[in-house]
Design a protein with these regions (language model features):
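Short, acidic Ser/Thr/Gly-rich low-complexity loop/linker segments typical of extracellular
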Residues: 55-72
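The canonical Cys-X-X-Cys-His
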Residues: 142-153, 202, 206
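Beta-rich, blade/repeat-based domains predominating
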Residues: 244-256, 288-303, 335-352, 384-400, ...
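Blade-level signature of beta-propeller repeat domains, shared across WD40, Kelch, NHL, RCC1
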Residues: 513-550
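A short, solvent-exposed loop/turn motif at the edges and junctions
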Residues: 55-58, 80-99
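Extracellular beta-sheet/turn segments enriched in Thr/Pro/Gly and aliphatic residues
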Residues: 101-124
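Conserved beta-strand positions in repeat-built beta-propeller and related beta-rich domains
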Residues: 259-265, 306-312, 355-361, 403-409, ...
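Structural motif
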Residues: 36-45, 78
Length: 550
């Protein structure tokens, strides 16, 4: 697991308090802490992420060095006090450790010196491992399923041979998607693990990229370039949710500025106030004592109520943000067996009084009539061609409460007509796209990420045509959304970078996060100028706020 490097300032590092007029002044106000980052290899270094954190605080603030190697924290972001400073720059370590003291109405200068690292492997992102390891695109595509629970570094550092890998993969496939290295959770449906020998081909490949037959990797470790230009113009604030097993998955921000999230690792919905740093957790009922715990999706309905799934617990839920009251809607007993894994909701029930969801274990779609509490079952993948088993990732409802489905195995977008029950499938232009998460706008256009293809597709439901947007290689986007200016924002579990794309030009900005950030759902707050981007750090129990400076 990669970690940030902590510094303690020594006499060899320049630290001083100076009159404000001699310091760099940002557009956000006077700098509280500033300095340059240098190395013998490069001199002044652009694209180094510098993080300031107070001991005992749950808040860390980060900025990135510009073309002159300078970083600067606005006074409004750092209260007076002592701060530990950490950095992120792939290929480099700190030459001298350090900390800095911020004083009222003055600017502290702390220059930082870096040296070449002797342990590059510990700094690589999942994307950089994908760049480095040998293999065909088809072979590497299997690894895209691994990063939901752990890094690819764990695979590369392992010593399992092919026979051992067949057992390991079968064991992993028997764990729920909510599992994490410190908390594996076996599913009730043991059949989903498969048999070890069915993973032989993948096991053979894994044994060629790890340390099973050698004491060092037989391939070059490759890295992504550091941020440059607009990539460096952002302030990132991370909020630690404290519990190690907490995994903020889906994120929403309400009109009062509270951040709501589902806990992918525990049975809680969280409400966090970034102003007061108060965290309120709403315990969610367990329906199956031995089933995996954790929640995935969270959405507001038309009345401002929060709907969520309980995954392996087999129920939907609705939380009233005003009262804290929670209502539950368990799946009907005739459908609610050990295979059930309810993910996502289709929420325009103001149209016809019905709510949609789907089960991963059976690939069934369910629709609940809220008035009668009766459930309907659909199996829409029956109409898809192919010998392979198709899987639906997300479901989401449009304004007429028609259900849209992102088909993950190959890459289709599907629709169930709410009135006629007719199923229609639309193949995404790029083959093997792996359609993943969606957003539906006010015009009922469907935005869907192409996980394997590193693209995002916009489907016009009136013309029934796709427009595809290409993201940087190895992005493998999880979810995306447009902001009020028409720009596209995407999250990833691979590069530790938030991607911002201008659809008119195709130009992208990539904001590097301060630490290992496995991102899931994105939330773009259009009430600010520039907009504010929110996401959960799913494997690091944090909520992340990114504020672009332009």
């Amino acid at each position: 697991m990669r970690s940030k490097l902590m510094l303690i300032l020594t006499a060899s590092v320049a630290v001083m308090l100076s009159h404000p007029s001699t310091q760099t002044i940002l557009a956000q106000g006077q700098a509280a802490l500033t300095g340059t980052v240098n190395s013998d290899a490069e001199g002044k270094m652009e694209g180094v992420v510098v993080t300031a954190s107070k001991p005992g605080s749950i808040v860390e603030v980060s900025v990135t060095t510009d073309a002159q190697g300078r970083y600067s924290f606005p006074e409004s972001r750092l209260d007076p006090g002592e701060y530990a400073i950490s950095i992120r720059a792939v290929g480099y370590d700190i030459d001298s450790p350090a900390k800095a003291t911020v004083a009222p109405e003055a600017t502290t200068t702390a220059d930082i010196r870096l040296k070449k690292t002797k342990n590059l492997a510990s700094q690589l992102t999942n994307a950089e491992w994908m760049m480095s390891i040998p293999g065909t695109e088809e072979q590497k595509a299997e690894l895209l399923n691994c990063v939901g629970c752990h890094t690819l570094e764990r695979i590369a550092r392992s010593t399992h041979d092919s026979d051992e890998w067949t057992q390991v993969v079968a064991r992993m496939m028997g764990y729920g998607a909510v599992s994490q290295p410190i908390k594996p959770q076996p599913m009730l449906d043991r059949a989903r693990a498969g048999t070890p020998e069915q993973y032989r081909k993948f096991a053979d490949y894994l044994a060629t990229i790890n340390l099973s037959s050698t004491d060092h990797w037989q391939y070059e470790l490759k890295t992504l370039p550091r941020p440059k230009g607009r990539d460096t113009r952002a302030i990132v604030t991370e909020y630690d949710m404290v519990r190690p097993t907490t995994e903020p998955h889906d994120i929403l921000v309400d009109k009062e500025g509270h951040v709501w999230y589902t806990d992918f690792g525990e049975m809680f919905i969280g409400k966090f106030d970034p102003k007061t740093l108060k965290l309120t957790e709403y315990p969610i009922k367990k329906f199956k004592d031995k089933a995996p715990t954790g929640l995935l999706s969270i959405e507001f309905d038309h009345a401002g109520k929060i709907w969520f799934d309980t995954m392996y617990q087999g129920s939907l839920g609705r939380l009233d943000p005003k009262t804290g009251e929670i209502s539950y809607y368990p799946l009907a007993p005739e459908y609610n067996d050990d295979r059930v894994q309810l993910n996502f909701t289709g929420l325009h029930h103001e149209v016809d009084g019905k709510v949609w969801t789907k089960s991963v274990g059976t690939q069934d779609i369910f629709r609940l009539d809220l008035a009668s509490n009766k459930w309907e079952k659909f199996h829409p993948t029956d109409g898809l061609p192919s010998a392979r088993r198709h899987t639906i990732y997300q479901v989401m409802a449009d304004s007429k409460n028609n259900l849209w489905m992102a088909e993950f195995t190959q890459g289709h977008l599907g629709k169930i007509d709410a009135k006629t029950r007719q199923v229609t499938w639309y193949p995404i232009p790029t083959a093997h796209a792996r359609a993943r998460r969606m957003q539906i706008d006010t015009e009922d256009r469907v935005l869907v990420t192409e996980y394997r293809a590193s693209k995002v597709a916009l489907f016009d439901t009136k013309t029934e045509k796709f427009t595809e947007y290409t993201l940087p290689p190895y992005t493998f986007p999880y979810r995306a959304n447009f902001d009020k200016n028409g720009e596209l924002w995407a999250s990833t579990m691979h590069t530790d970078r938030v991607v911002r794309l201008d659809p008119k030009t195709g130009n992208t900005v990539q904001y590097l996060m301060p630490s290992d950030t496995n991102m899931r759902t994105v939330f773009v707050d259009n009430s600010t100028t520039p907009v504010t981007f929110w996401v959960g750090s799913n494997h690091d129990h944090r909520i992340v706020k990114l504020e672009p400076l332009d």
